[in-house]
C-alpha cells in the first residue's frame, strides 16, 4: 500500500443514512449506498439530497459493477433474527440472512474488494445459535482475506439511553498504517452529565 488511503466508503443496508452521518463527521466521503427499502430511500434523499449514489434494491441481486472502488464497506444488516426480541433464527433467518448477500458482494468484487469492512449489529449476534452464527460470519470474512476484531459500544456514552451495539472491524494486512491518523473517541455534548458540567462549571 503506497501512501494514505482515500477515505471513501460504500454504505450497505444504508437505511436512512445513520452510518453515513457518523463517518462524514469523521472526515469520510460517501461513494455508494444501497438498501432494499424504498421508504428509507425517500428519507435518505430528503436528508442528503444527492441520491445518484444510492441504489435501491435487494443486495442478493446487486450488480457489483455499480460499486466504485472504496476504502471501506459498511454493513448494518438486519438484526431481526439475531435480536433477543426476535425469533432467533440467526443468519439463516429471512431478514438477517441478508448478511450472506453482503459476503457475496465482497466475493464478486474480487480484486476491487475494499481493504476495510465494518459490520454493526445487536450484541445478540455474539450468542445467536450458541455463537455459531458469529463464528461463521468471521470465518467468511477470514476466507476473503480479512483479519477480524470485534467490540461492543454502549450508546449511553453518547445519548441518555443504554443500548449496546456490536461492531466488527475487518481489515486486510498492513491497511491500518496506511490511514495515517490517530483514532478519536467522541462523547456527545447532549448527554445529561455533559449538560450539567457546562451549566454548573
Question: What is the predicted role of each segment?
Answer:
Residues 38-42:
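Short alpha-helix immediately C-terminal to the canonical SAM-binding loop
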Residues 30-35:
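Conserved SAM-binding motif I beta-strand of class I
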Residues 62-72, 80, 84-201:
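Class I S-adenosyl-L-methionine
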Amino acid at each position: 500500500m503506497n501512501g494514505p488511503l482515500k477515505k471513501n466508503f460504500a454504505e450497505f443496508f444504508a437505511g436512512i443514512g445513520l452510518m453515513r452521518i457518523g463517518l462524514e463527521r469523521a472526515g469520510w466521503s460517501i461513494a455508494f449506498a444501497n438498501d432494499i427499502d424504498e421508504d428509507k430511500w425517500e428519507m435518505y434523499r430528503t436528508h442528503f439530497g444527492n441520491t445518484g449514489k444510492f441504489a435501491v434494491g435487494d443486495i442478493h441481486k446487486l450488480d457489483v459493477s455499480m460499486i466504485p472502488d472504496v476504502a471501506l464497506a459498511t454493513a448494518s444488516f438486519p438484526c431481526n433474527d439475531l435480536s433477543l426480541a426476535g425469533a432467533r433464527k440467526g443468519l439463516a433467518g429471512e431478514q438477517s440472512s441478508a448478511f450472506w448477500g453482503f459476503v457475496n458482494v465482497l466475493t464478486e468484487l474480487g480484486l476491487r474488494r475494499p481493504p476495510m469492512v465494518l459490520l454493526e449489529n445487536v450484541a445478540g449476534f455474539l450468542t445467536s445459535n450458541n455463537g455459531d452464527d458469529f463464528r461463521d460470519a468471521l470465518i467468511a470474512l477470514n476466507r476473503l482475506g480479512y483479519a477480524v476484531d470485534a467490540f461492543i459500544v454502549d450508546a449511553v456514552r453518547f445519548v441518555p439511553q443504554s443500548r449496546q451495539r456490536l461492531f466488527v472491524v475487518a481489515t486486510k494486512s498492513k491497511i491500518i498504517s496506511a490511514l495515517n491518523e490517530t483514532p478519536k473517541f467522541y462523547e456527545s455534548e447532549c448527554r445529561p452529565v455533559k449538560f450539567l458540567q457546562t451549566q454548573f462549571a
